[in-house]
């Protein structure tokens, strides 16, 4: 396996843009030593509930927490909801050829002579001349005729359709409530391990009403997870500022966005989402097809390297690998290459214009002071609020964050530049002194946040 040379621990220490890798069948079969190297090179992991049983989720999270305990290094765990998508019902493979007339029917299953779709919302949404996209956009079908429970379309490309494949209508959102019933059941099934889940990612959210519904469900089930909102439809982009403000983390889901917008428009949409998130100081990730060729190749293409470099240079908090690590042949090489590329990007990211208030100004002042002194920033925080505020201003050095709350430590691990440390302490003064004793060997600017409007800052030159 061809992978970048170098000490992966050094790579991890220098990465300010965080790395998230999706766990799946490919990571399940890594040898113990390979899994350790793999997790050394990421800051968080993602598990897609659309492709993982409750037992698989439990197995993967246990492996991460075992590593975390052995290394004393917190990692964020993200579970990704399937969302209210429309998918093909049960069917034998259907080989569609370009120019062929294809029929969709309202049905749970098919003998392979038509495409079964067990959801009326699909047939309500589709109109004549619409374009139906399947297989990540590789299969395009132009709608020629519709009925209340059937649709005819002409294939504009070829492909093989199997059960469970997603169906997208170009430029349209389905009128389906969020969370979907499947998501409710999935969250109930994994609720026994809810304390190990740091973020729940919402798919196909269109408004803050959708986000609030998921938050209410999480509260009802006893989850304390933060909510990441995936921006992946035109409806979400149209409500972008609203969605960004009601989320804890924003994700540019490029795969689905590419189905709703022309591929030539995708870079513009991506930049808009990133800039809006930075404006409101919300952590922002970009996901999907970053190193896609590494599903079958031990090295990325030059175009992929340039894409990762350019995307990171926009100032994102994290980059998420999906199929590259979940089902690809070279998961360890993929995270190694991601780290290697990011090493050349960090210090070229400009400061981002952000909304200002007094607490923002305090955080910005800390960042500027540390930068002028060539110092690290040390923060002791109970909730992580000040640490996140500091990260908004994109410090150029590592920010060590001590916290007595392991959940806070885990959630901060995928925020720009933050290096969380679990430090038990009864109060802020004790916690900051413990942090300084661990990480205060070089010039530093240290603080423990805001209590009643009073700031305490220590500087070592």
Curated annotation (Swiss-Prot):
Residue positions binding substrate: 46, 255-256, 288
Keywords on record: ATP-binding, Glycolysis, Kinase, Magnesium, Metal-binding, Nucleotide-binding, Potassium, Pyruvate, Transferase
InterPro entries: Pyr_Knase, Pyrv/PenolPyrv_kinase-like_dom, Pyrv_kinase-like_dom_sf, Pyrv_Knase-like_insert_dom_sf, Pyrv_Knase_brl, Pyrv_Knase_C, Pyrv_Knase_C_sf, Pyrv_Knase_insert_dom_sf
Top-level division of the source organism's lineage: Archaea
Biological pathway: Carbohydrate degradation; glycolysis; pyruvate from D-glyceraldehyde 3-phosphate: step 5/5
Residues that, per the record, bind Mg(2+): 232, 256
Coiled-coil stretches: none
Residues annotated for ATP binding in this entry: 48-51, 87, 165
pH dependence remark: Optimum pH is 6.0.
Any single Gene Ontology cellular-component annotation: cytoplasm
Positions of the record's site feature: Transition state stabilizer: 230
EC number: 2.7.1.40
Binding site for K(+): 48, 80
Gene3D superfamilies for the chain: Phosphoenolpyruvate-binding domains (3.20.20.60), PK beta-barrel domain-like (2.40.33.10), Pyruvate kinase, C-terminal domain (3.40.1380.20)
Matches recorded under NCBIfam families: pyruv_kin
Family: Belongs to the pyruvate kinase family.
Name of the protein: Pyruvate kinase
Native source organism of the sequence: Pyrobaculum aerophilum (strain ATCC 51768 / DSM 7523 / JCM 9630 / CIP 104966 / NBRC 100827 / IM2)
Primary gene name: pyk
